Amino acid sequence: MTSFTGITAVANATNEMAMFKQAMKEVAAHPEWMSSRQIERQRWNPYSMEGGSTCAISGENFAIVASDTRMTQNDINILTRDAEKIQILNDNIILTTSGFYGDVLQLKKVLQSRLHKYRFDYRSDMSVDLCAELLSRNLYYRRFFPYYTGAILAGIDEHGKGAVFSYDPIGCIERLGYSASGAAEPMIIPFLDCQIGHVTLSEGYERPELTLDRAISLMKDSFRGAAEREISTGDKIHLVIAEAGKPVVVKFLPLRED
């Protein structure tokens, strides 16, 4: 039985034809004559990851949100040291997002327009619980070509309690006491699991109450620790504090810049 270059002769003609087709697919996918630039174009990805990290913590009557301000390219080039990843939607709702920065901006724009329409129609601001459901539906609507983001929505609910809602790119929603997203999430969450959730804290150790001052201190410590080990997190901490019955407070704190 005859054979062709690169494929071992087999007794069964059907198997030989299948192997030939597979070989043709491999040649078409990686032709020797194609330049590296052309191959790269074939593998084009509409998404990119600009690094950075975000976090949110809720308490009895407060919610705090923080992010770094660094934006990177391929974890090597620093595109800007003043990237905005937190958006104050109203006095009770704060959105923070990491991921592909184009989708970060678009998602913020979509949510802002929906809140403006709600305010126009009902003459009042949307609640954080209603906004959380709205964001989930908007993300799910784009599930076949999703926003490449890790969104966290935080604020004060209708009962005056702090609320944090965490999302995946297709809109799965969960209300938590704290959440993190972005490049440093694997470092921040274990720290908060120990200090707030007490998941990994040994028995017999003191479990202090989560006050606003302690939450702010933990937020600072988590970002400073992450900046020591994660290259795309750094420059400044953008901290937003929402308390029941009080205006939103915004602070910028220094973080390592190397």
Swiss-Prot record:
SUPFAM superfamilies, A to Z: N-terminal nucleophile aminohydrolases (Ntn hydrolases)
Subcellular location: Cytoplasm; Nucleus
The keyword Cytoplasm belongs to this UniProt entry's keyword annotation: yes
Domain of life: Eukaryota
One GO cellular component, as annotated: nucleus
Quaternary data: The 26S proteasome consists of a 20S proteasome core and two 19S regulatory subunits. The 20S proteasome core is composed of 28 subunits that are arranged in four stacked rings, resulting in a barrel-shaped structure. The two end rings are each formed by seven alpha subunits, and the two central rings are each formed by seven beta subunits. The catalytic chamber with the active sites is on the inside of the barrel.
Function noted in UniProt: Non-catalytic component of the proteasome, a multicatalytic proteinase complex which is characterized by its ability to cleave peptides with Arg, Phe, Tyr, Leu, and Glu adjacent to the leaving group at neutral or slightly basic pH. The proteasome has an ATP-dependent proteolytic activity.
Name of the featured protein: Proteasome subunit beta type-1
Native source species: Caenorhabditis elegans
